[in-house]
From Swiss-Prot:
Organism name: Methanothermobacter thermautotrophicus (strain ATCC 29096 / DSM 1053 / JCM 10044 / NBRC 100330 / Delta H) (Methanobacterium thermoautotrophicum)
One GO cellular component, as annotated: large ribosomal subunit
HAMAP family noted in UniProt: Ribosomal_uL1_A (MF_01318_A)
Pfam families (alphabetical): Ribosomal_L1
Residues spanning the signal sequence: none
Gene responsible for this protein: rpl1
Protein name per the record: Large ribosomal subunit protein uL1
Record-level GO BP terms: regulation of translation; translation
Length: 212
């Protein structure tokens, strides 16, 4: 299937009009024979793309002390201290803004109860509750992995729609990233990719191109 994916990716690039920004490349998977009313058929998985996402991903770290310092050194886009976390609890508008602005959150494990109290109401519904990490850990490997990570989820519709890179990435690398998403489908669905009704690729603003 990789050849078909590469050809579709190439066509999606050709059909996409030039924009004044680098567009993402998306994959859309329509699933058949899946009852999403059953909780066991819904999932929310994180997939590490072998060739990365092609653009920066904004990550916030909630931590104090040494972990906060290491997170800054590791290139975290935002570090939220305990005091700042408590302030966010009083400012729902700002908390929502941060929840929408940052794709992933990481939190010092012993601060998770406070995170749940002050940020849980805005992060929970967005499926962005932080990953807890020990205060003594070096967060750099975790942050590096998250920068290459996308969400693959099925909620109330039997459809997966996720980013797999950017339009300026090599066709083969994009195809390999799509394969990583398909491997998740193989693992999560009873019949794996045999349950694919159709698959499309597209740039952010471009038309869809059918793969299967």
């Amino acid at each position: 299937m990789q050849q078909e994916i590469m050809e579709a990716v190439k066509k999606a690039k050709e059909l996409s009009r030039p924009r004044n920004f680098t567009q993402s490349m998306d994959v859309i998977l329509n699933i058949k024979d899946l009852d999403v009313n059953k909780p066991e058929n819904r999932f929310d998985e994180e997939v590490s793309l072998p060739n990365g996402r092609g653009k920066d991903v904004k990550i916030a770290v909630i931590a104090d002390g040494e972990l906060a310092l290491q997170a800054k050194n590791a290139g975290a886009d935002l570090v939220i201290t305990k005091d700042e976390l408590e302030e966010l609890g009083k400012n729902r508008k700002e908390a929502k803004k941060l929840a929408n602005q940052y794709e992933f959150f990481v939190a010092q494990a012993d601060m998770m109860p406070l995170v749940g109290r002050f940020m849980g109401p805005v992060l929970g519904p967005r499926k962005k509750m932080p990953k807890p990490v020990p205060a003594t850990i070096n967060p750099e490997p975790i942050l590096n992995k998250l920068r290459d990570t996308v969400k693959v989820r099925i909620k109330d519709q039997p459809v997966v729609h996720t980013v797999v890179g950017t339009e300026d990435m090599d066709d083969e690398k994009l195809a390999e990233n799509i394969e990583a998403v398909l491997q998740t489908i193989d693992r999560k669905l009873e019949k794996g990719r045999n349950q694919l009704k159709s698959m499309y690729v597209k740039t952010t603003m471009g038309p869809v191109v059918r793969v299967i």
